[in-house]
């Protein structure tokens, strides 16, 4: 029996190996591979990052991008790619709980799952200790 075909649902983009590292952790924790596609901005100009994100969106058909920094080059590039795409969602400041939630929400349309995952990711952050 063959494994079920997994269709990518989102891109994770960031500096260095950020995207690959996060995706690796998500796959280890969830056991689900192929749901997220990594884009690294390492050694690329803003226009090259934009072209890479655009090409990945065209090849996969995804309408969700998670990025590392709100004002980072990957976020700015994804904003330009999705400028005229009404059904697209871009979430900056991605974290591990957010992506785990997104990956498990496979019965929900990806844009809606991304919005829900954003709330989960935000609520998963906490400060422990007083730091005195």
Task: Identify the residue ranges that each predicted region occupies.
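N-terminal loops that bind phosphate or other acidic moieties
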Residues: 1-132
């Amino acid at each position: 029996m063959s494994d079920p075909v997994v269709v990518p649902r989102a891109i994770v983009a960031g500096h260095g190996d950020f995207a690959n590292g996060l995706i690796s952790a998500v796959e280890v924790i969830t056991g689900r591979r192929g749901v997220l596609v990594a884009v690294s901005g390492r050694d690329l100009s803003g226009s090259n990052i934009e072209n890479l994100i655009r090409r990945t969106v065209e090849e996969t058909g995804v309408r969700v991008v998670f990025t590392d920094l709100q004002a980072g080059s990957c976020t700015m590039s994804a904003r330009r790619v999705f400028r005229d795409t009404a059904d697209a969602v871009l979430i900056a400041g991605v974290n591990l709980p957010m992506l785990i939630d997104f990956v498990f929400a496979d019965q929900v349309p990806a844009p809606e799952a991304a919005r829900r995952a954003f709330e989960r990711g935000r609520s998963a952050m906490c400060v422990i200790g007083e730091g005195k």
